[in-house]
Amino acid sequence: METEQDEMGQEEMSPEMALDKDPFQLTVEDVYDISHVVGQDLLKINREARGVSSLVSDLQFKIVRVLEMLEALVNQSSLSAEELKMERDNLKAEVDRLLRDGPQMGVGPDKMVIDLTDPNRPRFTLQELRDVLQERNKLKVQLLVAQDELQCYKSGIIPSPDDQIVTLENESIITSSPRSNASKEKSTVKSLFSFKQGKNT
């Protein structure tokens, strides 16, 4: 049993296994194993075929060059992978440090933490929201005043400008339509609008 396990372990560790690996998972040792396998095959060819030794030696130089290039590529990729791992570790350490120091530096009882990935996060300052609400309230008041004014015109409490005839004689105003005392009293809204109309004319 032990001999079977040893044979299986040797098969798993045999240099030819490097040829079956994914190219992106090759290590420098795998390149050396491939070099060993190719070298053994070249020796067999050289022994069996006596007339092709010059062809085998030319082929051997080309194979050595390809293996050197492969070794350089594997070295570079393993170095790049190591650099990436080191960079990842450095970034993790930096994030951990910021998380430890963050609550002490930036957050206080009068500060708010905003999650930038939250789609429902606030997008305006509190003062901007207050300004918008005040402007909305002013516009509502103006709308209500205009609606009251319109209602007064419709009900006849305030006569339309067509009912009034104004003549200027010695700076006196004469009107032709009779009005009651209640209709003579102008509201501040009416005086405001008449003041504005007087400016426009």
From Swiss-Prot:
The keyword Kinase does not apply. Pfam families: RH1, RILP. CDD domains: RILP-like (cd14445). Residues 14-108 form the RH1 domain. GO terms for biological process: cilium assembly; epithelial cell morphogenesis; protein transport from ciliary membrane to plasma membrane. Residues 175-201 are annotated as: Disordered. InterPro entries: DZIP_RILPL (IPR051241), RH1 (IPR034743), RH2 (IPR034744), RILP_dimer (IPR021563). It comes from the Eukaryota. Residues 121-197 form the RH2 domain. Its main location: cytoplasm. Keywords: Cell projection, Cilium, Coiled coil, Cytoplasm, Cytoskeleton, Protein transport, Transport. PROSITE patterns: RH1 (PS51776), RH2 (PS51777). Residues 67-155 form a coiled coil. It is found in: Cytoplasm, Cytosol; Cytoplasm, Cytoskeleton, Microtubule organizing center, Centrosome; Cell projection, Cilium. GO terms for molecular function: dynein light intermediate chain binding; protein dimerization activity; small GTPase binding. SUPFAM superfamilies: RILP dimerisation region (SSF161256). Involved in cell shape and neuronal morphogenesis, positively regulating the establishment and maintenance of dendritic spines. Plays a role in cellular protein transport. Belongs to the RILPL family. This is RILP-like protein 2. It comes from Xenopus laevis (African clawed frog).
